[in-house]
Design a protein with these regions (language model features):
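Extended alpha-helical solenoid scaffolds
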Residues: 2-979
Length: 979
């Protein structure tokens, strides 16, 4: 470029700034100096070097984001939630938590979530440990373990933690592995993908009771502490001395723990003397000897765990090289340590990859350093190798039953093999093991995120690859945060992250689609999106993880044709989810199909565009199905006996429970009335009735979709028809209960109503009044539940007959040839599987509001012209037409939706009654707070603080999740006012 024009009018002088010669004639490229590290970043690195446990932000599988305040005195709770106005997700405001008062042990320094249930361990500077349980709501925990009795001793400071994984389960038919459905490989030149299922072997040890974990912690003086839950729920402690650290150089600065395929724990400790020490720890729970998971110990058997150890290997983690001459002392200090457990690399040959120990050291140059130095992090790695097989050490040999003992003989000749280090020119602030332990995720202070293969350390997801998909990052998504970052917590799905920034703010960032403009993506890209989202959702389902941040990203593609329905179709086909309930199977099988609930939740959320906008038709069907399921569950739980503290009780003996069910009964009878009214309107529609004379069902379905009509699909689809039938029978059950309760009270208790000496009189009077309200709704219903159930039963029989006739051609004829008789059973089984797949395909399409199979047209024609016609003759059609169905929240008229929103009217998810802030119940003069679903924004009054009776408390605990599967959170009072 022209830099200086010659003053004498000659040619301008050209100066090349890309490469300026220095005094010695060497090329010296001009580069901008790296931004100096801030004071807060340097302080953060000092904290990482001083203690192994100082993670002050963490994200749970259930959705709670916990962070420690900058002053270290309280924990702040957040979660991502859907906005009721436009259905987009955002980060909630913090809910402060500081119920512990003063902190004699110094500030809070570390948070860690249990992978099994919603338990949060909070650790202070001297190692005191508090455990909170978040099973009920996202932001209001209960206390599981106090720390009042913990010692105030610096040597007890915790430098490493590890939660035991989930117990694989007592069901012998349950696979001993977690399925991973990646990669998805494109088949040929089509846009279809084949998902390769890979088994991820579960390695112990585990807590012997399902859905419970235990926390392992390593202290500065080399003590292992095991915090575990007794069968009665009390958390107890067991200890084991790993090292006798009485000298300063022997103190442990950082520690990592992982499970091993020998069903033991492996502990790696980094000491002040720059040593890495590997110790194998055996865990015996003291339970009766049992062979295999099928003979799991009973849940009420007292546990008495014992720990044993064996030292395996020692090496030095720091060996200065020539490149370290000008580095400061920080390079001789670790910031992170991780243990990567052995992985099954070849299930056929039973080959395992070795265990890997990983450490990170980071260097930040001083601003006035005379040397040309760059910011850098050095990632060191060692493999734990075995020279020869030895007999099991005596102190581990007595570990009891097979599940808790060493599964294969450990080695005495173990050694640590140093691998080549990896150097990056930025500061590592976080190391996470993801994708079932196969991938390492590094987060950096500049907000960048990097995924590397655990074995080769090659960077992953760098290039777009639509032919072989391991992660959504392969199909055009990028992940990053903002610069000036001190800590990062990845979501359990890896679809988003939260940052703790230098200014103390917590910020949420989702992955971003960068491959193409979302409005212009082609079919191949949509198919790749479906495959990537399916892999992530299936992995979340197999690990019990909430999928809210997956849905937050999917919201960007909700307007793409068939994205949501193809996503659910692929999920059902890949995970073999049952959607065919044509046969008369018990309703329990349908109700307990939790994966089907997740699929309905996906279409429910993506079909919802905010409370002031109409829902997509398939989203409306999913909403009704989810609410049906929730109501059936609530009535079932209320009707059954429960055992609490060795006492058997029936929730329906409490007036609070009956009053809560009154609204459910009203909602249920309104739903049946609305459904019949919709079907009767179709019966009176000449256009629709004429379509029943056509041989194909596509014209009929197209007309229904144009009218936003879903009633016919609700009764044709076996899953929703089964839920409707279950609801009818629950209504009849409650009608019977209320009739008997009223009769019992009027014949036995009413004469004693004025007996002031009988304390039961007032309670029985309240229960009598509640049952009268329930009976009023069941007896005045416009549609009798028993009659409608018979209508559904008749339709179900016709559908089964139609399936049998239409799919009979798929069944191979039986051969009388004696030579073929040996193949007859196999052939029959194959034919039955083919028929089952055919029905599954048809049922899945109807569940997603697509056209029924063509042979259903005759079934629908008979249903309308015979069964429904006779049913209509015995119904007051006018009352149905003019009835108020606002309780169902199903009317899609924009004006009605806006009016409802303006009045602040909502329907209580629990009691199924209309609520508003003006009409909300009060406690001590204060309106009750509301709980809201993080996924669909449904609300309910928070009755937990005022409901002390066991029956209603039991039901409220069952509503920690919304009907859509999203978690509930308590809203601040100011948010309730604007709701």
């Amino acid at each position: 470029m022209p830099f200086l024009d010659h003053s004498m009018g000659g040619e301008s002088m050209q100066v090349d700034l890309d490469d300026v010669d220095d005094l010695f004639g060497d090329g010296a490229p001009l580069t901008l100096p790296s931004r100096p590290a801030s004071k807060r970043l340097r302080q953060r690195l000092d904290n990482l070097r001083e203690r192994g446990c100082c993670q002050t932000i963490a994200w749970s599988k259930s959705g709670t984001i916990a962070s420690i305040s900058p002053d270290g005195q309280q924990v702040q709770l957040r979660y991502i939630r859907a906005n009721e106005k436009d259905a987009t997700f955002s980060l909630s405001e913090p809910s402060p938590l500081s119920s512990w008062g003063t902190l004699p042990g110094g500030p809070l320094v570390h948070l860690t979530w249990s992978p099994v249930n919603s338990e949060l361990a909070i650790i202070d500077a001297v190692g005191r440990l508090l455990i909170l349980n978040f099973n009920t709501t996202l932001n209001r925990p209960t206390l599981s373990r106090r720390w009042d009795s913990d010692s105030l001793d610096d040597s007890q400071a915790i430098v490493g933690t590890y939660w035991l994984q989930n117990y694989p389960g007592p069901n012998p038919r349950m696979p001993p592995y977690t399925p991973s459905y990646a990669p998805a490989v494109k088949t040929g030149n089509s846009n279809n993908y084949h998902f390769q299922m890979t088994p991820i072997i579960s390695t112990g040890p585990w807590h012997p009771q399902a859905n419970k974990s235990a926390l392992v912690s390593i202290t500065r003086n080399g003590m292992l502490k095991l915090f575990w839950s007794q069968y009665n729920g009390k958390i107890e402690e067991t200890t084991l001395e790993l090292e006798n650290s009485i000298y300063t150089d022997d103190l442990v600065t950082h520690a990592a723990v992982c499970s091993d395929r020998t069903k033991t724990l492996m502990v790696c400790m980094a000491t002040a003397s720059k040593q890495l020490r590997i110790v194998q720890v055996g865990l015996n729970w003291g339970t009766p000897k049992a062979e295999g998971a099928a003979n799991a110990p009973p849940g009420n058997h007292p546990l008495n765990p014992t720990l044993s150890k064996r030292h395996l290997a020692v090496t030095s983690w720091f060996q200065p090289g020539s490149g370290d001459l000008h580095m400061d002392s920080s390079m001789s200090k670790i910031t992170h340590i991780e243990m990567l457990p052995a992985l099954l690399t070849s299930p056929q040959n039973k080959e395992w990859s070795p265990m890997i120990i990983l450490t990170v050291r980071s260097f930040v140059p001083e601003q006035n350093s005379p040397y040309a130095q760059d910011t850098q992090s050095i990632i060191d790695r060692w493999e734990l190798l075995s020279d020869q097989q030895q007999t099991v050490h005596s102190d581990i040999d007595q570990l009891g039953n097979r599940r808790n003992s060493v599964g294969s003989p450990p080695t005495n000749g173990s050694k640590l093999k140093k691998l080549d280090p990896v150097v990056v020119n930025k500061i590592v602030i976080g190391v996470n093991l993801v994708n079932f332990g196969k991938v390492l995720c590094f987060t950096y202070n500049d907000g960048s995120v990097e995924y590397r293969d655990r074995t080769t350390m090659d960077e992953l997801h760098h290039d777009v690859n639509l032919d072989r998909i391991e992660s959504v990052l392969d199909i055009g998504f990028s992940q990053s945060g903002e610069p000036s970052c001190l800590q990062v917590a990845l979501s359990p799905t890896n679809f988003s992250l939260v940052q703790l920034c230098e200014d103390g703010q917590v910020k949420w960032h989702s992955i971003h689609y960068t491959l193409a403009d979302i409005e212009a993506i082609n079919d191949a890209q949509v198919s790749a999106l479906v495959a990537g989202f399916t892999i992530a959702t299936a992995q979340a389902a197999s690990q019990g993880t909430q999928i809210d941040d997956i849905l937050a990203v999917a919201r960007n593609f909700a307007n793409k044709d068939a994205f949501a329905t193809e996503w659910v179709k692929t999920m059902v086909q890949m995970m073999k989810i049952t959607v065919d309930y044509t046969e008369d199977t018990p309703h329990d099988h349908l109700i307990k199909n939790g994966i089907l609930q997740m699929c309905l939740s996906i279409t429910n959320y993506l079909g919802w565009r905010g409370d002031a906008l109409p829902r997509q038709s398939w989203g409306k069907l999913s909403m009704i199905a989810l609410n049906l399921r929730n109501t059936v569950i609530m009535i079932t739980l209320s009707s059954n006996n429960i055992t609490l503290n060795k006492t058997t009780l029936t929730p329906l003996d409490e007036p609070e429970v009956v009053n809560s069910l009154v609204g459910c009964v009203k909602w249920s009878t309104d739903l049946l009335a609305w459904l019949c009214d919709s079907l009767f309107c179709l019966f009176g529609d000449p256009k629709f009735m004429s379509l029943l004379k056509l041989p194909q069902s596509a014209p009929m379905t197209a007309y229904l979709n144009s009218q936003n009509e879903i009633a016919l699909h609700l009764v044709l689809c076996s899953a929703t028809r089964g839920l409707l039938s279950a609801l009818c029978r629950r209504i009849s059950l409650l009608d019977s209960f209320s009739t008997r309760a009223i009769s019992w009270y009027e014949t036995r208790e009413k004469p004693n109503i004025n007996n002031q000496n009988d304390p039961r009189a007032a309670a029985h009077a309240a229960l009598y009044a509640a049952y009268q309200r329930m009976r009023r709704y069941t007896s005045s219903s416009l549609i009798k539940a028993d009659d409608f159930d018979r209508l559904l039963t008749s339709l179900g029989a016709d559908i089964r007959s139609a399936y049998s006739a239409a799919l009979a051609g798929l069944e191979k004829p039986r051969s009388s040839n004696s030579q073929a008789s040996q193949n007859q059973n196999a052939s029959t089984q194959a034919s039955q599987e083919t028929i089952a797949r055919g029905r599954q395909h048809c049922e899945l399409g109807m569940l997603l509001l697509q056209a029924p199979p063509p042979f259903f047209v005759s079934v629908v024609d008979k249903f309308f012209n015979n069964d429904l016609k006779d049913f209509r003759a015995n119904t007051d059609v006018a009352k149905l037409y003019f009835a108020d169905y606002s309780l169902l929240e199903i009317d899609n008229e924009p004006q009605l939706l806006e009016n409802r929103r303006a009045r602040g009217i909502r329907v209580d998810l629990f009691k199924r009654v209309e609520i508003s802030q003006k009409s909300s119940n009060t406690h001590n003069g204060t309106p009750l707070p509301w709980r809201a679903c993080s996924r669909c924004a449904s609300v309910m009054e928070d009755l937990a603080p005022v409901s002390t009776k066991p029956g209603i408390s039991f039901l409220l605990r069952s509503h920690s999740n919304c009907s859509c599967g999203g978690r509930m959170a308590v809203l601040p009072q100011d948010e309730v006012k604007h709701n």
